[in-house]
Amino acid sequence: MKLPKLSAQKKRPEEIIAELKRHPAIAPLIEGAEVIEYSAHVIPEAGYEMMPKLTADGLMVAGDAAAMCLAAGIWLEGVNFAMASGMYAGEAAVEAIKSGNCNASGLAGYRKRLENTFVLQDHKKLRHAPHLVLSDRVQHL
């Protein structure tokens, strides 16, 4: 659910989840279940166009902080991007430290790794998908 719609309903996220749990299609599936833990946070819907610069001197940005999430309503993908970008950041850090160059140019291997894998390839390929899925035309079918 997009933030403006949530705000217009004047309901907290946990109230909406409670309503969902009472829905006739859901309630029988979770009858007798116990909530062990609850958490919620805003998921970035920025996509490829809003992705920040991924490196600077002594710095690499990964996961949600780098808008590496494909989020469009019921479709959400991001844990795989966070894990992979973290791994590639670690590899690039080792490489930069070994070379003695931890400035942006020394960390360029990070972006190269991302570009050569599903992380940035998927973001580039699907960069228009969130706009389509979240469009008024699709949301009001």
Residue ranges and their predicted role:
Residues 7, 50-53, 73-81, 101, ...:
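Alpha-helix capping and helix-loop boundary segments enriched in small/acidic/polar residues
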Residues 41-73, 138-139:
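FAD-binding beta-loop-beta segment adjacent to the flavin cofactor pocket
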Residues 14-17, 77-83, 120, 128, ...:
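Generic alpha-helical propensity signal that fires on short helical segments
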Residues 69, 87-140:
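Active-site-proximal substrate-binding core of FAD-dependent oxidoreductases
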Residues 53, 62, 66-97:
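A conserved active-site cap/scaffold subdomain adjacent to cofactor or substrate pockets
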Residues 1-42, 77-80, 95-99, 111:
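Conserved FAD/dinucleotide-binding core of flavoprotein oxidoreductases
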Residues 1, 6-9, 37-38, 45-47, ...:
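Aromatic-enriched hydrophobic runs in primary sequence
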